[in-house]
């Protein structure tokens, strides 16, 4: 069994990420492998390569300067990353009044964020993933005349009366 590289993504992209990228004319690749020059696949016969910091094995657990790597971890599938959720903060203005500010974003960006958040939950609804219903031809329903409708109702009433008499 082949070993999976740690740099490969575990899951495919979720639909809400596609919404954010829909403004671009061409879609970016799903995964770009790291450059091969930084880390060779096999060890070289050179003893000098072991002393280089680039060839040193990376730690899987523990502290370090790898904060961007750890940002996306710990999320459920389909959950937006926490960095994009601007929670409002209350701050005192110089005039003494309270005002609500978003975390590092202008008011227009909050509206855009809420729009993306709504779209994210729209993709997770049961109705979105169901197969679409075939189109209904309303002209077939309009062809029914009022006379045929009343005749049908009268026929049903006669059947009910007969059933009740017996």
Swiss-Prot record:
Q: Where is this region: Disordered?
A: 25-116
- Where on the tree of life does the source sit, at the highest rank? Eukaryota
Q: Per its record, how is this protein called by name? A: Uncharacterized protein C9orf40 homolog
Alphabetized InterPro entries for the sequence: C9orf40-like (IPR042349), WRNPLPNID (IPR033461)
Indicate whether Repeat appears among the record's keywords: no
List-wise, which residues carry Phosphoserine? 105
Per UniProt, which keywords does this protein have? Phosphoprotein
């Amino acid at each position: 069994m082949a070993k999976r590289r740690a740099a490969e993504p575990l899951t495919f992209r979720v639909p809400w990420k596609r919404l954010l990228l829909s403004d671009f004319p061409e879609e970016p690749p799903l995964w770009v492998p790291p450059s091969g020059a930084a880390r060779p696949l096999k060890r070289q016969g050179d003893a000098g390569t072991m002393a280089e910091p680039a060839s040193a094995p990376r730690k899987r657990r523990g502290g370090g300067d790898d904060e961007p790597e750890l940002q996306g971890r710990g999320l459920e599938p389909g959950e937006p990353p926490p960095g994009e959720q601007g929670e409002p903060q209350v701050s005192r203005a110089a005039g003494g009044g309270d005002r609500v500010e978003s975390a590092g974003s202008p008011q227009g960006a909050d509206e855009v964020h809420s729009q993306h958040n709504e779209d994210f939950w729209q993709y997770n609804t049961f109705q979105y993933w169901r197969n679409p219903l075939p189109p209904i031809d309303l002209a077939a329903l309009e062809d029914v005349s009022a006379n045929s409708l009343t005749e049908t109702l009268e026929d049903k009433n006669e059947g009910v009366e007969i059933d009740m008499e017996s």
